[in-house]
Structures are given as structure tokens and as C-alpha cells.
């Protein structure tokens, strides 16, 4: 419980908030100038008047947080042996999100070759080298088609199977860093009230899965003004407290920096939002959340610290399962926040109640971290 570390963390948060407030107006102007705005063409989750209200809203507002956090961390957070991989993984994930955002706006719709068509071409195509190419790329085609159950259908943006590959890369880098660079202590899983359980190399697939799942969970929650930003603010505030309690200086400062930047972002993102986070922010910050929790060896707390995000993601998984295998819907619409919209709840009511529930679980996570 170092007072000096807490004082320094608060300074980082203040600097990040001030920097983000200054950058926000510039970013909004640039997004509008280059027409990086929400389009009803692919935002099929919006309904009625809400669709019309949000069309033309700048997206990629998450760049505000990504830029400020990266700049302050690289300039002032001197323990780079602990921060270069989290920032790098955040950057990879944010790049993927930016590509998806931009392709959804400016890209052309792509067509996927079906598996039966590929098999037919292997048999009947006149040129042997084309047949060879189809044979060599058959595993990729099978993987591509198998992800259609997750919604990887032809469109403008980055498709699910493409996202999974890049997210796997981000997860693999994180797993390498935790397993080989942070030391044997991180080969164990901390359990509240009990101690540590050795996972040995099993920690590697666990880390990869959690980085991928958490990034997508945060992405799914970015559906209402203020929901993802405010929930991330609460999460990183709690994570700052846990890092400080644990005496992890580099991560206390990094999490405080994210918290400060999110204060400014959320100010501009609450309804009516000046901009929306976009995939560039949700995927980047979701990956950073996962890696920062695991880097302080509190992996077991990740579903608690990210409670709302995990609930939103699970609601989508359950909806897909019920529709595919039981032939009916579990929710009126997924993710969960849209279910409550269809029940007649206002956007503000949903967001505020989700925030409060999320805050409650973050308090539980802080308490558990001290046991």
C-alpha cells in the first residue's frame, strides 16, 4: 500500500484524462472529415428511430484511449519489460479492429467460395496448378466455412475466421510472455482463500483463450451509448486498485492511465454520444484488460472484473446454441442489452443498471483479491 505509488497513479490518470479531453475534439473533427461514421447498412442491430438517430455518428472513437495510453506509457512508464508486451498486444488488436471499422465503411462486399464448390473445382478444373492450389488451400476453406456458425458470413469487414487468426496471434504472444518471460510463479493459478494451483504448460492455451474471448466480449458490449466505455472505466479503476494493493507498480500506472483516458472517452460517449468506440477500441482494450489481469496473476478474477462483458458474450453464445440446435430464441435479441431494448427499456435505463451491476462485481473482485 505505497502512498507514493498511489500518488503517482493518480497523476498518470489525471494526465491521461487531460490529454484525452484535448485530443477528443481533434479526433471528432478528423473522423467527420474523412466520413468514418456509423452506417445503417451494416448496423442491423439498431431499430427504428434509434437507427436513424445514430446513422452518421463517428466511430473509431476508441482511438482516443489507444493513442493516449500508448503515448503516456511509452514516454513515462519506465518499467518497459512489463509494459511493452501489453501495449504491443493492445496495438495488434486495435489494428485488427481499425481494419474492420474501415472495411465496413469503405470496403467492398466479398464473396466466399463454398466448400462444395471448392471440392467440385478440385475435380473438374482444367488447369492442374489451379486444382493443386485448391487442394493446398482446402484446410483454410474448411476452417473458413466452419466459422459460419459464429456469424462469419460474406460482408465488407474482417470476417470471423480472419479475426480469430489475428486474435490467436495476440493471445500466443501474451502466452509466450507470461510463460517464458514472467517466470515460474505465473505457471500457477491463484485461487482466493486457497492459494496457488500449478497449471504448468496448460497456462498457455488458457491465456490464448482468455485474450481472444475477452476482446470479443468487450466488442459485443459496445452496442449502447456509454455501455462499453463506462463499464471499462469501472473495470480499469478496480484493476488499478488491485494492482496497487499487490504492489505491481508498472501495472498500477498502466491501468491508471487507461482509467484516466476512459474518463474523457466516457464523457463524450454517454448519450447523446459524440462518437462511438468501434472495434479499434473494444478489441484493443479488451485484449489489454485480459493481459493486465493475468500479468498480476489474478486470472481467476477476470470474469468478475469483466462481468458485464462476459454476460453479454455468453448471451450471444446461448442465443446461437438455442437457434441452431433447439430451433427457438432464448432472448428477444442478443446480446443481452438488445433483449432489454426490445422489452421497452430505455437506453439510459439499461446502461445505468448495467453499470451498477458491473460496479458491484468489480467491488467483489477487489475484495477477493485481498483474500
Regions found by a protein language model. Give the residues of each.
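"…together with the soluble PPM/PP2C metallo-phosphatase catalytic core" -> "…together
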Residues: 1-276, 280-311
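A short, structure-level motif marking secondary-structure boundaries and short turns
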Residues: 11-14, 39, 199, 320-322, ...
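Short, surface-exposed acidic
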Residues: 38-42, 347-352
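Solvent-exposed interhelical
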Residues: 223-234, 328-351
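Short basic/hydrophobic patches in alpha-helices and adjacent helix-turn junctions
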Residues: 294-295, 320-323, 339-342
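Juxtamembrane non-transmembrane "cap" segments at the membrane-aqueous interface
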Residues: 313-333
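Final/C-terminal transmembrane alpha-helix of multipass membrane proteins
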Residues: 348-368
Amino acid at each position: 500500500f505505497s502512498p507514493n505509488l498511489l500518488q503517482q497513479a493518480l497523476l498518470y490518470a489525471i494526465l491521461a484524462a487531460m490529454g484525452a479531453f484535448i485530443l477528443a475534439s481533434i479526433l471528432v473533427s478528423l473522423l467527420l472529415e474523412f466520413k468514418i461514421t456509423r452506417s445503417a447498412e451494416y448496423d442491423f442491430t439498431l431499430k427504428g428511430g434509434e437507427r436513424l438517430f445514430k446513422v452518421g455518428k463517428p466511430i473509431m472513437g476508441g482511438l482516443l484511449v489507444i493513442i493516449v495510453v500508448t503515448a503516456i506509457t511509452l514516454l513515462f512508464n519506465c518499467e518497459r519489460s512489463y509494459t511493452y508486451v501489453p501495449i504491443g498486444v493492445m496495438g495488434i488488436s486495435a489494428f485488427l479492429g481499425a481494419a474492420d471499422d474501415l472495411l465496413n465503411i469503405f470496403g467492398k462486399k466479398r464473396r466466399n467460395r463454398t466448400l462444395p464448390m471448392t471440392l467440385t473445382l478440385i475435380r473438374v478444373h482444367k488447369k492442374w496448378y489451379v486444382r493443386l492450389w485448391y487442394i493446398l488451400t482446402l484446410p483454410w476453406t474448411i476452417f473458413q466455412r466452419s466459422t459460419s456458425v459464429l456469424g462469419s458470413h460474406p460482408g465488407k469487414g474482417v470476417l470471423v475466421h480472419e479475426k480469430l487468426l489475428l486474435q490467436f496471434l495476440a493471445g500466443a504472444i501474451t502466452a509466450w510472455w507470461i510463460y517464458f518471460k514472467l517466470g515460474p510463479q505465473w505457471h500457477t493459478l491463484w485461487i482466493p482463500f486457497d492459494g496457488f494451483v500449478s497449471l504448468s504448460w496448460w497456462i498457455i492455451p488458457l491465456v490464448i483463450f482468455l485474450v481472444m474471448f475477452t476482446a470479443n466480449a468487450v466488442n459485443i458490449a459496445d452496442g449502447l451509448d456509454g455501455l462499453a466505455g463506462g463499464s471499462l472505466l469501472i473495470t480499469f479503476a478496480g484493476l488499478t486498485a488491485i494492482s496497487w494493493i499487490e504492489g505491481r507498480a508498472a501495472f498500477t500506472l498502466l491501468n491508471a492511465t487507461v482509467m484516466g483516458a476512459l474518463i474523457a472517452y466516457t464523457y463524450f460517449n454517454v448519450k447523446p454520444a459524440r462518437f462511438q468506440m468501434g472495434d479499434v477500441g473494444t478489441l484493443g482494450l479488451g485484449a489489454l484488460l485480459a493481459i493486465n489481469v493475468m500479468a498480476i496473476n489474478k486470472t481467476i478474477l477476470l470474469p468478475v472484473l469483466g462481468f458485464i462483458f462476459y454476460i453479454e458474450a455468453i448471451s450471444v453464445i446461448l442465443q446461437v446454441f438455442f437457434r441452431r440446435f433447439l430451433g427457438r430464441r432464448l432472448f428477444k435479441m442478443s446480446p443481452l442489452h438488445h433483449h432489454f431494448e426490445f422489452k421497452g427499456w430505455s437506453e439510459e435505463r439499461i446502461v445505468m443498471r448495467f453499470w451498477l451491476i458491473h460496479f458491484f462485481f468489480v467491488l467483489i473482485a477487489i475484495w477477493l483479491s485481498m483474500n
